[in-house]
A protein has these predicted regions:
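N-terminal export/assembly segments and adjacent metallocofactor-ligating motifs
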Residues: 1-250, 287, 374, 378, ...
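Flexible, glycine/charged-enriched surface loops at secondary-structure junctions
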Residues: 107-111, 253-258, 305, 336-343, ...
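Extended redox/cofactor-interaction regions of prokaryotic respiratory oxidoreductases
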Residues: 127-203, 207-214, 238-241, 327-442, ...
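Short beta-alpha connecting loops at secondary-structure transitions
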Residues: 223-231, 454, 458-461, 470-482
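Active-site phosphate/pyrophosphate-binding segments
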Residues: 243, 261-385
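Internal, active-site/partner-interface "lid" segment
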Residues: 252-274, 505-523
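Catalytic, metal-anchored helix/loop core of enzyme active sites in primary metabolism
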Residues: 445
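Long, contiguous, secondary-structure-rich segments that constitute the structural scaffold
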Residues: 477-551, 635-653, 657-754
């Protein structure tokens, strides 16, 4: 265990030096925050942090501005005759009861749904207690950004390893050849890959080896790589199948240390037999010989790894692509070994990653229920988030009448968000747990504000499940809440849970529900909940964190290992503790009953005919892909002035040759049309994108009446999700295909009806 250096720190709420872990992304940068006269005076990287060692990005420096944002909601609000009124917490909970209880009494709990947003993954309180709301409220179907994000990876990991969050991550600190597909860590800082200063690590790889980026766009990551291979969107699975074909055809397969724990090699051989490099070269845009060369490079390099992320997930063959990345790593001997793809060993396990009852052992028993309108089947407890709007729009028995949103803005972040924007006012009840009056929450009847990140502790449970080192780092709050008697976010969720089950929100026994949740978590670890609960004089997320640390791989297990980790001992190390890099964990990390990696799950093999039918594309077709920016995080950091500086980022990027054929120039306003809808947006020409591909960022579309986002509304941008057809999906997982959307682009002056 490597502890950090300890220097004098100010107590919570006092002026002076504070340490805090940035909660915005997988980089989890350690911050040093200076507070003067009760305000954030400066933020810099904490050089003593055992994880990030002083690294930080622009988002981390914005925490003070976020905390002090005058638009941030600090007091509960209810809507009266169309106008917002600030009220007491008790009155806000009473209003929740007045709204939601009649809906449940009249229509049943099936008329209620919840949407939980991306910030939950980084929230100390919400991340641990969303499971209480979704698991105990009785709400039958809820929605999340998971099905416009990583759900294909959840699916492939469930089928291969028997755990829906059992993700192998690239050991980038020890690899010599890194192949990046559909990821841009220069902007994301890593995704489903937690590492400090990813781009710095990539520079180190280049000094001793090689970095290759395969992407339709020459991203900031690709610009700093040794090689950029532009690929046609949606063909990644075909490309990877050709890699697999070469490995098998040229006898390059080496299962390495996991040879005795891999099942399905012959099924994989049969599946790849029809996918030689020559078959996919034209479709992918990558020459057949380069495909074969890359297969040989991967097989011939001792420490190499392929890393695929959101560009592979958010496409119509996301499950196949996510699966095949792992297949290539396994077949080349770069699985469960240093420098390859390895399973992390987090110091604290996350409550999010608990097995789903009935789906243990990686069984493909999906479709346990389906949506009313489309008949979309459940996969791993989720249905496509794009189904939510049609379930509200379509009359009849089972129509959604009430919505609870938690830290989410689905009007901007989900397919057909413009339709959701139109139907939300028709709901009979809408309750939002949120910090801002945004494009979604403006439709709510009640807004229950959470705390600023700096007003609550932090420990990144979920993100540390993807970390290349076993690290734990607890951050105390920097400030006390403005109202010391206000409920914390976890208490809000428990009250809403009780309300859904028939108890008025204002009368819910928060402690009893919290103890019941804690008792269940203890049970999953083979502990007696009553005995363990008696050791605490408090509940809430700190109790949960202590238990997950103590029952983790380095914990004291409540006295069984006296020198083990506890929350109290972690608090004594304000710069964190680092237990070292990933270690081989097969078969222990597997959740399959036979301890085997299932290389060729039949559920995924059954999707190959669909790929075969779609792999050949119209060469004149334009397709849209998404992009992100270092100073943005989905839709929720656009109200920070420091992050909004510079030129307009919400543009359609197009290759100069494609623009010339259409008579377009940089700065022109164009109409972009898909089967999902149409938008107008300025165009920006570049050579750094594959011809036939256009790109837009997501998370924009501000400027709507009734929002309270002064800075964001000054640079509203356009909502690209209007172009996302709700039924354009990765069929095995139900994940939205937000990349590879066929579009037309015309000058707005020439567009019919413009």
């Amino acid at each position: 265990m490597t502890p950090g250096v300890s220097l004098p720190l100010a107590p919570v709420g006092a002026d002076g030096r504070h340490l805090y872990t940035c909660p915005f992304c997988e980089a989890m940068c350690g911050l040093e925050i200076q507070v003067d006269e009760g305000r954030v005076a400066g933020i810099r990287g904490n050089r003593d942090d055992v994880w990030s060692r002083g690294h930080l990005c622009p988002k981390g420096t914005s925490l003070g501005a976020l905390h002090e944002d005058p638009d941030r909601i600090r007091t509960p609000m209810i809507k009266v005759d169309g106008q917002w009124q600030e009220v007491s917490w008790r009155r806000a909970f009473e209003r929740c009861t007045e709204l939601l209880a009649p809906v449940i009494e009249k229509y049943g709990i099936g008329a209620v749904t919840a949407y939980t947003g991306n910030p939950l993954a980084h929230s100390f309180s919400l991340g641990r207690y969303t499971g209480v709301l979704l698991g105990l409220s009785g709400i039958p179907i809820s929605y999340s950004p998971g099905t416009v994000d990583q759900w294909p990876k959840n699916l492939s990991s469930h089928l291969m390893y028997g755990g829906w969050w059992t993700f192998p991550v690239p050991d980038i600190e020890r690899t010599d050849l890194l192949v990046v597909m559909g990821a841009n860590p220069a902007a994301s800082q890593g995704s489903l890959l937690a590492a400090p200063d990813v781009m710095g690590i990539l520079s180190e790889i280049r000094q001793r080896g090689k970095v290759i980026v395969i992407d339709p766009v020459r991203t900031a990551t690709a610009a700093k790589a040794d090689e950029w291979l532009p690929i046609t969107p949606g063909t990644d699975a075909a490309f990877l199948l050709a890699i697999v074909h070469t490995l098998l055809d040229e006898d390059l397969v080496n299962l390495g240390s996991v040879a005795d724990h891999v099942d399905g090699l012959e099924a994989m051989r049969a599946a790849a037999a029809d996918w030689p490099a020559e078959r996919v070269a034209d479709a992918t845009g990558i020459p057949a010989e380069r495909i074969r060369e890359l297969a040989r490079e991967l097989a011939g390099t001792e420490r190499a790894v392929v890393y695929g992320r959101i560009g592979l997930c958010n496409q119509e063959f996301g499950s196949l692509a996510s699966w095949l990345v792992d297949v290539v790593n396994i077949l080349t001997g770069h699985f469960d070994t240093p420098g390859g793809a390895m399973f992390p060993r987090p110091a604290a396990w996350s409550v999010t990653v608990q097995p789903i009852p009935g789906l243990e052992d990686g069984v493909p028993q999906f479709g346990r229920y389906a949506t009313r309108v489309r008949g979309a089947k459940e996969v791993l407890g989720q249905v496509p988030v794009s189904c939510m709007v049609e379930e509200m729009e379509t009359p009849g028995e089972g129509q959604l009448k009430a919505l609870i949103t938690v830290a989410g803005n689905p009007v901007l972040s989900t397919p057909a968000g413009h339709r959701l924007d139109a139907v939300l006012p028709d709901l009979e009840a809408m309750i939002s747990v949120d910090l801002w009056l945004n494009e979604t929450t403006r439709h709510a009847d009640v807004i229950l504000p959470g705390l600023s990140p700096l007003e609550q502790p932090h420990h990144d449970d979920l993100i540390l499940q993807f970390a290349i080192n076993s690290v734990a780092n607890y951050s105390p709050p920097v400030f006390e809440p403005d109202d010391p008697d206000r409920p914390h976010e976890w208490e809000i969720l428990i009250r809403l849970t009780g309300l859904c089950t028939g108890t008025p929100a204002e009368d819910v026994d928060v402690a009893a529900l919290d103890d019941g949740f804690f008792d269940y978590l203890c049970f999953t670890q083979g502990l007696d909940g009553a005995t363990i609960c008696a050791q605490y004089d408090h509940g809430g997320p700190e109790r949960t964190l202590d238990m997950t640390l103590r029952t983790g791989p380095f914990g004291d297990r409540y006295g069984e290992n006296p020198d083990g980790l506890t929350l109290d001992t972690l608090k004594q190390q304000p710069n964190g503790v680092n237990f070292g890099p990933m270690v081989p964990q097969v078969p222990q990390a597997l959740g399959t009953s036979d301890g085997m990696v299932r290389l060729a799950p039949q559920y995924l093999l059954d999707d190959l005919p669909r790929l075969a039918a779609r792999v050949a594309r119209d060469p004149d077709e334009l397709v849209l892909v998404s992009r992100r920016h270092l100073r943005s995080n989905n839709s929720w950091l656009h109200n920070v002035q420091a992050l909004m500086k510079g030129k307009d980022r919400c543009t359609l990027v197009m290759h100069a040759d494609d623009a010339a054929r259409r008579g377009l120039s940089t700065g022109d306003v164009v109409t972009v049309t898909s089967t999902g809808g149409s938008i107008e947006v300025p165009i920006e020409l570049t050579e750094a994108i594959k011809p036939g591909v256009v790109s837009m960022p997501h998370g924009w579309g501000h400027g709507k009446a009734g929002t309270r986002l002064a800075i964001a509304n000054g640079t509203p941008g356009v909502n690209t999700n209007i172009l996302s057809p709700p039924d354009f999906l990765d069929e095995p997982s139900g994940n939205g295909a937000l990349n590879g959307i066929p579009v037309t682009v015309t000058s707005s002056s020439a567009a019919p009806g413009s």
